[in-house]
Design a protein with these regions (language model features):
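Active-site neighborhoods and metal-handling regions in enzymes and metal-associated proteins
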Residues: 1-611
Length: 611
């Protein structure tokens, strides 16, 4: 199993740990301390030894930050985690904050005590975030204090060691472009802009540029590493050699100089001396890294990670690999959904369902000689009220049976060498209510509107986001998460800069893979989400039209529960899409499924709906 269902944190230690942290404030010369859910690489997924927020508070979500003051402690989360936060932390110690509308810097400017001294670990905060904090503190006469050591690390006596996951080569057959070509492209751009070098601080960008993958963090196959690429084409990769076997080390030796991570500071300082201009991404690179450049009299040039957009715009090899991975994943999903349909309500638990799905993926991967490398995130397997927790993680404590008359939501994904998948299906268990069916159909309408959208060049994610919500808005409902996130190519299941959300201003470009996942959640009762992955491509021309259009191609093929759809709520075009999607799903997956009973189930699950 690639996931555990054990309880990984508990709220019971929060009070003592916060008290111990506060006890050190005077000696550190601070009045408050920020604890982000981050490591020094500022990635979404972090190794166990960097789960400081969970250790301190009990909150295990993938996004959040705690502000610990002398008499107050606030954990800021986004809409996905409001319910989870309330369940995981001690409410007598911590209050909840709004990470989107009133993040720590906004809260401090409005509520911080005059002259407040805020301590941070400069390795855990990007440069852009530090600027926001400094500006907020200046409004209250406060000071940002950069601490030489993280005070939590001295309190966390059994903190796990740094990971040493093995590095593998991502061959050009999967990557589509040679690493030396990617390095040369970056170097040429640096030279054109009169820059000495760029610091690649995002491990996913390092993995993409050098065509390598790693195993340092759960479910995201990148190595925790940084790189410096010089304008003259030289590349230095700061990667522990204990992670590279003979073949990867020999491969890397042909395209770069591999150095230990401890050499980064000296090499970054060396390229910065005498006014060397070094490009860093202020939204990714730790503030401490920028300070190394400044201390060496170099010039920090802020700009986007040069790999971020090219990594998001998949080449044909990556798109084709993703399509193949999704067919394989769809076959595993069908095997799982068939099994679930045969089980009596009340006899299958949330954990057993997650285990069976992972086993199906492993079995199909073995039969197709494309093994399951990992899951792409911990499976969200939630029944009834648990489905209303957007990022619910079932544990041995919360596990329960999936009962008749309720909705079961399973959001899962896989890592294959040729692609990353992410799919959500909501299933009715036995006879469900008309309210369940109504909201399911409204969510489906939004998903279809995104799937069929046509839009001109220059369209941004925020321009399309309302399409997924209009049907819900008309019913006086909404959902508190984005409609879609970018997805990597055997990399992170959450990839930027592409998104479909209210705040996404990134132009959608051909080759970008995104999720399409509207939902509806009623706390304490039920939750609904339907998710396919899609990619941007050119749309067919319309006779008489004079503007080139883009659209989406669907990558995910898996039946959507017909029993939950009220056909009369769909337009003719929406019903046509639904039936055509099921026809294509049947045609795509039937050749991959050999069990007679599973084939019969797929046939029935994809029959057309009628008014």
């Amino acid at each position: 199993m690639f996931q555990s269902f054990e309880v990984t944190s508990t709220p019971q230690f929060g009070r003592d740990r916060v008290s111990a942290l506060r006890a050190g404030f005077d000696s550190l010369g601070i009045d408050a301390f920020l604890v982000p859910r981050a490591d020094e690489f500022n990635g979404e997924y972090v190794p166990a030894g960097s789960e400081r927020l969970a250790w301190l508070t009990g909150f295990t979500g993938s996004a959040g930050i705690a502000l610990i003051l002398r008499t107050q402690a606030i954990v800021f989360v986004d809409g996905r985690y409001v319910t989870q936060l309330a369940e995981q932390v001690d409410g007598s110690v911590f209050s909840g904050g709004d990470l989107v509308n009133e993040p720590p810097h906004v809260w401090l400017a409005a509520n911080g005590a005059k002259g407040l001294r805020l301590g941070i670990d400069p390795w855990l905060h990007a440069g852009a975030e530090v600027r926001r904090l400094e500006k907020a503190l200046s409004q209250i006469g406060g000071t940002l204090v950069f601490l030489p050591h993280n005070p939590l690390d001295r309190l966390w006596s059994d903190r796990p060691a740094e990971p040493l996951g093995a590095v593998s080569i991502q061959n050009v057959a999967q990557a589509g472009v040679l690493a030396r070509e990617k390095i040369a492209t970056v170097a040429a751009d640096l030279s054109k802009k009169n820059l000495a070098a760029v610091l690649i601080a995002d491990p996913s960008s390092v993995a993409w540029i050098f065509n390598i993958r790693g195993a340092d963090v759960p479910h995201t196959p990148h190595p925790l590493a940084r790189a410096i690429i010089h304008a003259d084409g030289r590349a230095e990769l700061f990667l522990d050699k204990r992670k590279t076997g003979i073949e990867p080390e020999a491969y890397l030796g042909q395209i770069c100089t591999q150095l230990p991570p401890s050499a980064l500071e000296e090499r970054l300082a060396a390229v910065s001396r005498n006014g060397g201009r070094v490009l860093i991404d202020p939204d990714i690179a730790s503030y401490a890294l920028a300070e190394i450049i400044r201390r060496a009299s170099g010039e920090v040039v802020e700009g986007a990670d040069p790999a971020k957009l090219p990594r998001a715009v998949k080449n044909d090899v990556e798109i084709n690999g993703s399509a193949a991975a999704h067919l394989q994943d769809g076959a595993a999903m069908v095997e799982f959904l068939y099994w679930l349909s045969q089980e009596k309500p009340g006899t299958v638990s949330e954990i057993v369902a997650a285990e069976r799905l992972e086993a199906a993926r492993a079995r199909v991967g073995q039969s197709m000689q494309n093994p399951l490398k990992d899951i792409s995130f911990d499976t969200i397997s939630g029944a009834g009220e648990h489905a209303a927790i957007m990022h619910y993680r079932v544990t041995t404590e919360t596990n329960r049976m999936i009962e008749a008359g309720e909705l079961f939501l399973i959001d899962s994904g896989a890592q294959y060498i040729n692609g990353t998948t992410d799919i959500t299906r909501t299933v009715g268990i036995g006879r469900v209510t008309e309210e369940h069916r109504r909201f399911f159909t409204l969510v489906l309408k939004g998903m279809i509107e995104i799937s069929t959208a046509r839009f001109p060049k220059g369209t941004r994610g925020c321009d399309l986001d309302p399409l997924a919500r209009i049907a819900l808005w008309r019913a006086g409902a909404d959902f508190a998460h984005g409609t879609g996130h970018g997805v990597g190519s055997y990399l992170s299941v959450h990839e930027g800069p592409q998104r479909i959300s209210r705040l996404s201003t990134q132009e959608l470009l051909p080759g970008m893979i995104l999720s399409n996942e509207p939902g509806y959640y009623r706390p304490g009762s039920f939750g609904i989400r339907i998710e396919n992955l899609i990619y941007v491509r050119g749309a067919e021309e319309i006779e008489g039209g004079d503007t080139a259009m883009l659209g989406f191609e669907t990558l995910t093929f898996c039946p959507i529960d017909r029993s939950l759809v009220i056909p009369e709520l769909l337009t003719h075009d929406q019903l046509h899409w639904f039936n055509d999607y099921h026809r294509r799903t049947r045609e795509a997956l039937m050749p991959l499924i050999h069990d007679h009973d599973v084939r019969a189930w797929l046939e029935n699950a994809t029959l057309p709906l009628e008014y």
